[in-house]
A protein has these predicted regions:
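Active-site-proximal acidic segments at structured loop/helix or strand boundaries
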Residues: 164-213
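Active-site proximal helix-loop segment of RNase H-like, two-metal nucleases, encompassing DDE(D)
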Residues: 123-131, 142-164, 178-186
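Retroviral integrase
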Residues: 1-149, 196-342
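Extended, charge-rich low-complexity interaction segments
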Residues: 157-171, 297-308
Length: 342
């Protein structure tokens, strides 16, 4: 029996049994688990200054934001560089703050957004502050660098050398969301995280920490044809926990490449066949690596840091600085020009 247990740990559950014997289970009850933030804390910091920028990971665009008070970060996927798409992404962020009782008073951004922000100013009554030519918003540039570092670190943990567009999009969103899960240095509270301040659900180990991003899973595939030979599970790549209250999972179907949501999954060790399937999907979309690009979708190679942006402040805010981080060349990489050079 010990040999069988060892084999199960190495090879995981029997996939044929999962595909043939899995049955539907009773859904989990809906339980609201949101920490109540003192109203005085929200009232005191109600007016927010927001810094925004655009970043590309391969061909996938994101509007990145960070505020100067709560330090909440977001990366909203955009499908094009049109003003309508920028407006849609910004509306997602503003609704999040407004829903928690905060008001965006000023938006700091590069001149690229000037035409768009005239509409935002009129519709949403937000004050705009545009940088001078060749200048940048320091908080936005540091935020891009921080998100980029987290994406690159997470990518290095994956067994895949290339990932498709869907996985890139969720990788950026997941890494950005994780930066909001714990109290930040320079924020408004040493006890409440940015996510808690905006009324997002609390971190639950059983819901949010069971399966890592990029894992190979068998997702329960419910069908009304119970007497047929239709498979009971689907091959999928794990993306992130679902955002609903009862729990669930957002996945990439390995057969179609589309995002699906399932209530229950079973993690299976990643095999060479799975790795080849993911990399083939990425190669078909023209992705062979992970590259960070500017708003013109041009790859920026390592160069000097952007003038006027104090990257030491980013280290102070994101993590406790140690001597190795500052003295041994954390900045020798000189990545910021990989981001939007606006």
């Amino acid at each position: 029996s010990e040999d069988i247990n060892i084999a199960e740990k190495i090879f995981g559950p029997d996939m044929s049994s999962l595909k043939g014997k899995s049955t539907r289970r009773k859904p989990n009850p809906v339980k609201e688990d949101i920490i109540e933030v003192p109203k005085e804390l929200i009232t005191q910091h109600r007016e927010i200054d927001l810094c925004i920028d655009i970043m590309y990971v391969n061909e996938c665009g994101f509007m990145t934001t960070i505020d100067r008070t709560i330090k909440f970060r977001s990366a909203i996927p955009i499908t094009s560089r049109t003003h309508e798409e920028y407006y849609r992404a910004l509306d997602v962020v503003l609704r999040l703050y407004n829903g928690a009782g905060f008001v965006i008073k000023t938006i700091h951004c590069d001149g690229e957004f000037r035409a768009l922000m005239e509409r935002v100013k009129d519709d949403l009554h937000v004050k705009m502050n545009f940088t001078n030519a060749l200048d940048h918003v320091p908080e936005a540039e540091r935020n891009n660098r921080t998100i980029k570092e987290r994406i690159r670190a997470a990518f290095q943990r994956l067994p895949y050398k290339a990932i498709p567009r869907v996985m890139i999009r969720y990788l950026a969103m997941t890494q950005t969301q994780q930066l909001n899960l714990f109290p930040v240095k320079g924020g408004v509270s040493p006890y409440f995280s940015p996510a808690t301040m905006l009324g997002l659900p609390s971190l639950d180990y059983n819901k949010h920490c069971q399966v890592p991003y990029g894992a190979f899973v068998q997702a329960n595939h419910e069908t009304n044809q119970t007497s047929s030979n239709v498979t009971r599970t689907l091959d999928a790549i794990y993306l992130r926990p679902a955002t609903n209250m009862q729990g669930g999972h957002e996945l990439m179907d390995l057969n179609s490449g589309h995002v699906i949501t399932r209530a229950r999954v079973t993690q299976i060790p990643v095999t060479e066949i799975v790795i080849r399937a993911v990399e083939t999907m990425a190669h078909q979309q023209g992705f062979k690596d992970l590259k960070f690009k500017n708003r013109h979708k041009q790859v920026f190679h390592d160069a000097d840091w952007i003038a006027g942006v104090d990257y030491a402040d980013a280290a102070d805010e994101d993590e406790e600085e140690d001597e190795a981080y500052t003295d041994n060349g954390a900045g020798d990489d000189n990545d910021d020009d990989d981001m939007d050079d606006q």
